[in-house]
Amino acid sequence: MSKSKNNVINPLDLVEEFDPEVIKYYLLAKISINNDGVFSNELLKNTYNSELANTIGNLISRTIAMIKKNFDQPVKFVQTDDKNDLLAIASIVKNTKEFQLHFDEFAIDQAFDRMINLAKSLNKYIDLTTPWLLTNNLDRLEIILNILLNGIYAIATMLEIIMPQKVQIIKEVLNLNELNFDLIFDFRKFDEIVVNEMMPLFLRK
């Protein structure tokens, strides 16, 4: 990117198309502070659609929609020995710890790679457990949706570092005033919370 090649990006034009928090996400999550990075409108758009809209946004939208459709009371944590449940719980714990480790070492891009990895694993968990087919088995559905809620909490806690305004919307949906890394590992935190309806968080571009 240089003036001589006439490929300089005007930041004022950029913020007309993208939320400033989205731009900040790309700069911190996709570019290493230790190496040169590549930036273009196309890469920014692809990252936004792939990671924020498709991976994180769809995860939250699907989970909240299934909760609001099937429950009017808190979705509580229940002990489980199901393999897919245990793998999802392990993914929440593992990716959170690795996020914290990378962040403490200033490997910000690697930290947020763990966040996206967690979101992808939870989307896979949805595909494997097919909760939309469990409307006649609410006990099983509750287990799955609580695990997903806990995963969303972890993702929101990580994402708040870069996108506090967007995460404020998530907190309102989750009916929470604040997020805390220590609470990620407490899977009973939603036992007395009724979540709220939500609108799409990240609209595709």
Q: What does each model-identified segment do?
A:
Residues M1-L86, N177-N196, P200:
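Catalytic adenosine-cofactor/nucleotide-binding cores of aminoacyl-tRNA synthetases and other
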Residues D13-E16, Y25, N46, A65, ...:
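Charged/polar, solvent-exposed surface patches and flexible loops
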Residues K3, L14-V15, L44-T55, N84-S91, ...:
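Secondary-structure capping and boundary motifs in well-ordered enzyme cores
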Residues G37, L101, F106, I116-K205:
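Basic, alpha-helical terminal appendages of large translation-related enzymes
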Residues I60-F99, A119-N137:
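Conserved, charged catalytic cores of large soluble enzymes
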Residues V8, N41, V93-K97, I152:
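Residue-level signal for cytosolic alpha-helical hairpin/rod architecture
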